[in-house]
Amino acid sequence: MKTSFNKYGRKDGKDLCEIVLENDHGMIVKVLNYGATLEKVLLNDENMILSLNSPADYSQERNYLGGTVGRIAGRVRKGQWRHGLETHQLPINDGENHIHGGIGTDTEVWDFKPSCSENSARVDLTLLD
């Protein structure tokens, strides 16, 4: 198992990185910290998912390929939810509703921490408010 990362640019003073996870059987997964985007899943050098040509292309295209759904998967009616007696208002981004975590998580630069062990390779991505 192996992890590495390559810097390919900057946004808002932060490095844009392609994180590479590899196993011992020829599988390679590439994730971008730009939008926590699943960029490629390679098996024997064949990409198993639809991808753009380069990491930099993801900041130019708004097609959501490999995109991570925000903190909420699905639609929240009128962007409101209740926790106990308190009502919370979320940003509206789908008519009068909130959908898939709100506006812009796909264009944020996420913090990342790759790690590996004898049996696994992983990356943790975090987006702080």
Curated annotation (Swiss-Prot):
Pathway: Carbohydrate metabolism; hexose metabolism. SUPFAM superfamilies: Galactose mutarotase-like. InterPro entries: Aldose_1/G6P_1-epimerase, Gal_mutarotase_sf_dom, GH-type_carb-bd. The keyword Isomerase applies. Its EC number is 5.1.3.3. It holds the Pfam family Aldose_epim. Keywords: Carbohydrate metabolism, Isomerase. Disulfide bonds: none annotated. GO terms for molecular function: aldose 1-epimerase activity; carbohydrate binding. One of its GO terms (biological process) is galactose catabolic process via UDP-galactose, Leloir pathway. It catalyses: alpha-D-glucose = beta-D-glucose. The keyword Isomerase applies. Belongs to the aldose epimerase family. Mutarotase converts alpha-aldose to the beta-anomer. It is active on D-glucose, L-arabinose, D-xylose, D-galactose, maltose and lactose. This is Aldose 1-epimerase. It comes from Lactobacillus helveticus (Lactobacillus suntoryeus). The gene is galM.
